[in-house]
Every structure is written in structure tokens, then in C-alpha cells.
Amino acid sequence: MQCVRSFLLLCFIATTAVAAEPHWSLQPMKCAVVSGESHPIDFFIVQKLREKKLTFSAEADRVTLLRRVTLDLTGLPPSPAEVRAFARDARPTDEAFMEVVDRLLASPRHGERWAQHWLDVIRWAETVGFETNGERAEAWHYRDWVIHALNADLPYDKFLCDQLAGDITGADAALGFLVAGPANLPGQVGRDEEAMRSARQDELDEVIRTVSQGLLGLTIGCARCHDHKFDPILQRDYYGMQAVFAGLRYGNRRLRGEQNDEWTSQVPAKQKQLADLKIKLETQRGQLELRKPLDSVHSDEFAPVTARAIRMNIRATANGSAASLYEFEAWTTDGTNAALASGGARPSASSFALANQTRDFENLTDGSVDRRQAFPWVAAKGGSAWLRVDFAEPATLKSITWHDGSSVPADYTIEVQRPDGEWQRVAHTEDRLPRNDDTRAASQVKLKNLSAEQTQALVSLIATIRKTEGELNRLAAGPQIYAASFTTPDTTWLLRRGDPMQRLAKLAPAIPAVLGQAEIAPGAPEPRRRLALAKHLTQPGHPLTARVLVNRVWQNHFGNGLVDTPSDFGKMGTAPTHPELLDWLALEFIRQGWSLKKLHRLIVTSRIYRQASHPREQALRVDAEARLLWRFPPRRLEAEAIRDGMLSVSGKLNLKMGGRGFDFFNQRGGLSDYVPKQTFDANGWRRMIYAHKVRMQAVDIFGAFDCPDAGQMKPRRTRSITPVQSLSLLNSPFANRQAAFFAGRVRREAGNGAAAQINLAFRLACARAPKPSEQQARQQLAMEHGLEQACRVLFNSSAFLYLQ
């Protein structure tokens, strides 16, 4: 009996000891000693291979190696000239290959390729998602920032800090990271208090998931409703981290920098131009009749401008009767009504009367119009009145809509109060005069004592004023980007079961204990909270930040990561296949100044990367998926590399970088009715990373190749092989048109000889000469059905679609 008790006690002690030991990913990184006789990466891989009695494969031939590394680092195939130069280089392969790698890493194409991997992780898109899926017109600035940062080899610790606290570090565009995901913003679903609170919790949850899974490989979001079931993350940790971002808001913000300074310098000249035009108009005002009546529902659109309040001044009505309104709405670039009383907007007005005392004044901004049951707000005095709405937080407005109580003409002005306190006019009565593109004849515009020519001149003058005001508003607002903006942080509450209506206790901002010892002062200013988190995560000894990043890079080079679950390094994730290598890479990455390009160079110059991909029967029996890396694992290219490759091979690739993207669909936002475009001009022949990214909408053709729709994080893309992929490429108007361009290029460069044409087609598309059987088959196909069909089939071949 005593022996049994002793045994049970020992089991308890052992179990307790195991339970107390931190999970592998939370333990300090260990630096292994590496033999100087081989490449450091090969040193770790060969040890695992020996355990299974396996060996490396032979090195790939130079042509295969060049195509592999070129597609891997730039996403584009090498040109025949580049293949010839590398194949004929008399230097040792190590030396010649290193020069190739440095050339590719220095190419602007490198940042375009690897930015897509990062955007997948954080599910970046240019629409909101959820029920509205409205457009984020200025979100492309963040995409361009990522591309530029990767091309400049911005150290990863700086890359991370800029994205968490770019307003402090001077990288405004980087703040697009925090609001990259979908957002169900307050007021979009429901306007009652519970719906508003839930929406706010949801949008902050998206931020926490982006940061925790994208940067740290931890599912902190699982602790929103209760303590994490598997990892040492408490519910208090979740809300403490939420408090770090409690001042964050989604929307447009002003982009500081040279462009902003340039725009600001142009404002005085534009103001003078506008003043001169208005003086010219005033001299003719007496000739104008009273403006046409307002429609019962009227809208004014203008250049996006960030505002904290809006006011409408009604100077006169047609018959001197009192002005009246049923509803007043201020619409943001995200499709949200910022004037909603339920969203915290506060209306005020000059003295007024109610047509029926049962209608509250705040009904003006309740987002609902029902003339059968509602009664309008009516100014107490005829002729003039004003209405003002102060927003709960600054909003980027693009249009104003109001529902007039009666269709009487009005003389009005609408102004917004910018964050700096200045008022800016965005709409006024003259906006309702005919534009210079009005389809009506000049004789139909009723102006007193004016000929048709004089009327048209006046209409053109008013149109010029309107255009100039739009230009002035745009300059005064400054360049806009879609990125996180910040206000005084909301109070953060610990919520019972995550229910926003069941508040338990106030919580101060805090870094979760699982991430290591760090403190944020309870009263820390909003930006200092985020900066403290960023500095903590980029400490050289942090156990997660570097591990997670090097694993992502490894995965995108070999198809699989050292950890199979790149965004979950917790207990529900997988253990690393080569833990010593993972730690060594992470520490070396930090030692090399967090340089991503040095990390790429280290990986692709290793022997395991340069192996042939040919299968070996004995090795396949032991490790069919080549997880131990006894050969280079072949894989299908991603959708972007396939489309970009087609354009490159056809000679139509437009290498213009940056700016607003081209469209795959007939519209840029909305929940439904997306129609894929069938033809593209030169702008649509840019690299696919520059396509306008619509959330929740698969891209025509290339969606079949597992191109994610940004509805969810995609730390690792699916690599399916289906008949739909081949059918899509064979029947796609885009692919067929590029095949025709491809054939035309081949004819121009190879002449009329069939053999020479097929040879060049293979060298362009596959970076190699065709095998005799391939030459014969494609030549026969070209003779019977035309060179276009041979090129079309080549686009569908494994030699083109796969990285070998």
C-alpha cells in the first residue's frame, strides 16, 4: 500500500512539474552550436535526415534553380536572357547563384511578391465586409506602404512598430494594419444601445485578432468570453489588451508628409481663385431667378472631409414660410450615417416648433423617415434657421442627405467643422444650379433677361465655382488614407461571457501576462499604450515575435512551415518539426538586425533549397510529403503568380507600381451584383497585387486557384488540384487573349519556323527548352489548330503552373 501511495505521489509531482513548465513557444529561444563545415540550415536538416536514414537529393540544374528562385522571390518567371546568362556563367554555382539572389532581392518586384503573403495573413481588403461591404477608397495606401517597406528592407522590428504606432513613428500609412480586417461598425446593423456596444466590441476584437494571430501566433481572441481553454490567457488579459486599443477608430485620416505640405501650400491660391469667381457671380446674382425647389429627398456630395460637427444654415425659403426637415443624415466614406443620435450624435438648432409634440427633436437624426407617422421639425420663425449635429467622434464625410418637410425652395449653406476647429463649406444653394454637363438645353434654364448664350456662360461659371470649391475642400482636407485614427480611449470593462450589456469591472490597459513581464501605466496617453506594446514585442528576447515571423518566411519558401499552424503557436497548434532550427533562425534573424532580405538570402542559398525536386522511391516510403526536406517540395503557384506570369510571358505585363488599383468587377463595393470584367486594358494588366480587393467575393478564374477573399485570415493558402482550374484557364477570355498575345510575341521573335516557335514558347513560359516529346506534340498541335492553341495549352501545363 505504501508503494502505491509513493507511486501516486511521484505521478502527481511529475504531472505538476510538466504542467508548470511553459509551452514550448513561450520558453526562451535556445541557441544551438552549429558546425562551421556546412551551411547552418543544412546542419540542422541533415541531423533529422540521418535519424530516418535519408540523405539530401542532388542539386537542381541551373535552369530549374533560376526559375525556382526567381518565381519565389519576385513572383515572375525569368526571361530567356536571364536563363542564358546564368546557365553560361563560368563561375562556381555558389558564387553565380549568390549574385542572382542579390539581384532578385534588389528588384522592386520582390516587395510586390512578398507583400501579398503579408496581406493574406492580416486579411487586408478594400471593402468593409459584413452586411454593407462598402468600399474603403483610400485603403490602397497601406498596400503600397508594405511593398515599399519590404523593398527597402525595413527592419522587422521597425516594420512592426510602425504598424502599431505609426502616428508616433511617422508612418501614418502603416496604421492601415490595425484596421485591415472586416468591420461591422456601430450603426450598420442596429441602432439600439446593445447593437452599438456589440458592434464596438466586434471591431476591437478584429484588431486584437490581427495583432495576436498575425504578429504573435496566439489566439488571444478565444478569451473574449471566458478564460482560454488551452493557453494561459485569462479573460482579463483579453480586455486588458483591448484597453490598449480603446481609442482606435476605423476610417480615413490625413496623411502627413511632403504631399500634405504641398497641398496645404496650394490652399491660399485656390481660396483667392474661388473668391474672384464668386465676386464675378455676385455681379450677376440679380439676374437669377429663385433656385429650383429642393426635392423632398435631397443629397449633396463633396470631396471626403474629416469633421467633428456639421451645420446647415437656411437663409430663406421661397414664400417666407418656416423651413422644415424630416431627417438629416451625414454619410461617411464607409457608408455609415455619422449623424445618428443612437450613435452618439448630438443635434441642436435655432428656436423651433414641432408640427406634432409627439415627435422628439432627436428624431431628426434617428435614421428613419416615415411621413405617414412622423411629423417634421419646423423652425419657429419663417425664412431663416439653423441646424447643427455634433458627432460622437470625428468622421470622414462624403455626402449629406436630408428629407425636406415640403418642396419649397430654400437658400442654404452646409458647413463642417474640421478637427482643427475651423469651419469649411461643403455645399450650398448654387450646387443645385445646372452643371456644365447638364443634359438640358440652355434655353430650359429659366434666368431673367438672359439670352441662351448668356445663360450658358452663367451655368459654366457656376460649374467652375463648384469645381473650384471641390478642389479647395480636397486641398484643405489634405491627402486621405484609410487607416486607424485615435481619440480619447473609451473605458474598458471586463464583460461577463463577453456580453457588452453585463459589465463587471473597469480594466486598465495591460499586456497579457503570457507575453512576458511588462507594464503600462493605467493613465497612459492613448498612443503610449500602443507604443509600449510595440516595444515589448520587439525586445530581442521575446519568445514569439521572431519565431512566428521566420516560420512564415520558411513556409512561403518551402510550402510548409517548421510549425504547421503559422498563426497558432499555442497548445492547439502543432509542435515544430525542427525546433532547434526554428530557434536558431529566429536568433540569427534578430542578430542580423531583423533584416528580412538577409533571412531570405540565408534560406535560398542553403543546400536544401537548391535540391532537385525529383522523387526517390525509398525516401517516399519514409516521408511521402518531404516534410524532412530530402528534396525540394514542388508546389503549384499561387493565383497571383499564375496571372502575372501569363502577362509577363505574353509581353503585356504593365509594371506600373502603386496607386489606386484596377478592377476585377463592375463595382467597388456593395453586398451583391458583382459582375466579373471580361476584358482589361493596360491598367488591368498590372500585377495582381494592384487589383482592387473586394472582400467576400472570389476573383473570376483565379478564385479557382485558392485566391482568398479576405473574409478570414489566411496564414496558409489551400493548394487544391481540381478539374475546374484547367477548365477555367482553357475557357477564360483573359487567358485566351493572353495566349493570342503570347503567340504574336513568339511569331515576332522566332520567325515563321514551327520548331523555333515552339522552342521559344517553352523558353518564355517554362524557362527551358522543350523535351523531344513536348516539341513534337506542341508542334503538331500548332500545325493543326494554330499557334494560339499551343500557347493556350502551355499556360495549362504543369511546367508553367508549378514551382519545381
State what each model feature region is.
Residues A790:
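Globin-like tetrapyrrole-binding proteins
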Residues V267-R308, T317-A395, G405-V408, E422, ...:
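Disordered, acidic Ser/Thr/Pro-rich linker "stalks" and the adjacent N-terminal cap
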Residues A19-E37, Y482:
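N-terminal pre-domain segments of enzymes
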Residues R5-T16:
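Bacterial N-terminal signal peptides
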Residues E37-R67, D72, P77-R109, A125-D162, ...:
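Primarily short, surface-exposed interaction patches in extracytoplasmic proteins
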Residues G170-P268, F702, K714:
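Sequence context surrounding c-type heme c attachment/ligation sites in exported
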Residues F328-A330, I400, I414:
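Extracellular beta-strand elements of beta-rich domains used
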Residues V408-D420:
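Short, surface-exposed beta-strand/strand-loop-strand elements in extracellular ectodomains
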